[in-house]
Amino acid sequence: ESRGLGDVYKRQELKAEGVDFKNLKISPLASITMPYHIEIDGYSEAHSGKGKIGTTKKGIGPTYTDKAARIGFKIQDLYSFEALNEKIDMILPIKNKMLKNVYGLEEYTRDCILSLCEKYAELFKPYVCFDWQDLLNRYKDKKILFEGAQGVMLDVDYGTYPFVTSSNPIGGGAAVGSGYGPAMIKEVVGVSNCLLYTSDAADDLLCV
């Protein structure tokens, strides 16, 4: 039941080091990585043989898979008892069949997932920004810096596929990820590196 909360609890470690979270805002539209995503990610990587891509095994790929399949959980679901229970009843049987019949992994009980979601709701509540569109409008005439991790060669569409991440870390991803319209982004700055580096999505060295 505690699986899937590890990264969330790192917040406490960061707080102990003096990191201030008062400006942290989480969109209610953000997808939630569930513990079964982490298990599926680890299993897939371990059984990929020569096709192994060096994933971080944090469940990111499977989370995107469920998002695209429209069977994922979003932050906003945590704060609607009816919506959350409906989603659990719809999604969990699908995931359990997959866990058992495809991956040979243990199934999750309904109570386990509901309890986990309740813990997520409590942990995230101080940071969820339900009026995020108003927040964007408030700063529309100001200069805002969007900083993206990773880079072009890890883009799921334009990178060194399949040795890529699951999203679009290119400039256009700033608009999709933030809710800002593409026309509102006036300048894109790319940072290049002539050295070899190890990508977050692959164990191989890539040259950029």
Give the label of every model feature segment.
Residues 1-9, 197-208:
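Single conserved hydrophobic/aromatic residue that forms the stacking wall/gate
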Residues 3, 77, 106, 160-164, ...:
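Hydrophobic alpha-helical scaffolding
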Residues 54-69, 143-178, 196-199:
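Conserved phosphate/anionic-ligand binding catalytic regions in large, soluble enzymes, centered on
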